[in-house]
Amino acid sequence: MPRFPLSLLSALLAAGLLAACASPNEDKTAGWSTDKIYAEARDELNGGAYDKAVPLLEKLEGRAAGTPLAQQAQLEKAYAQYKGGEKAQAVATLDRFMKLHPASPAFDYALYLKGLVNFNENLGLFSWLSRQDLSERDQKAAKDSFESFRELATRFPESRYTPDARLRMTYIINSLAQ
């Protein structure tokens, strides 16, 4: 069995330790205020860079924990996930928001967004191109959407989101009845 010189072994060990201590992913937001993080996240959202907005909103949620800004970050993260095509993550984020903040003034929006995520789950590009209607697709998402819209209309009849939710409920009922 070959013997390695002690100096070579020491050099390899030192290089390994240095590599382990290196931080390849420095946090560019380390010195930022919550307002700056929020502004950057909004810029990414407005520019359609949803994949860049999500990590910023996650950082904001952690740094502003327990504040209305953290709640706003959760909702905007769900929106970014939805628009970025991460629908399952958006629903999970909204479910978490609703569990943690049942008395939030934005609870109606959370229900509406959850309804939209599931509603549009059935309206993908393939379905549109094939002219396939809602009654021919998996109906679980439609039922979940209907339930979110129904809860919104029942609990928040005066919400600004309720009229659109009712229209979408009618569409779902008519589509499933075909």
Q: Which residues does each predicted region cover?
A:
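Acidic, polar-rich low-complexity tracts and alpha-helical solenoid repeat scaffolds
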Residues: 2-5, 17-178
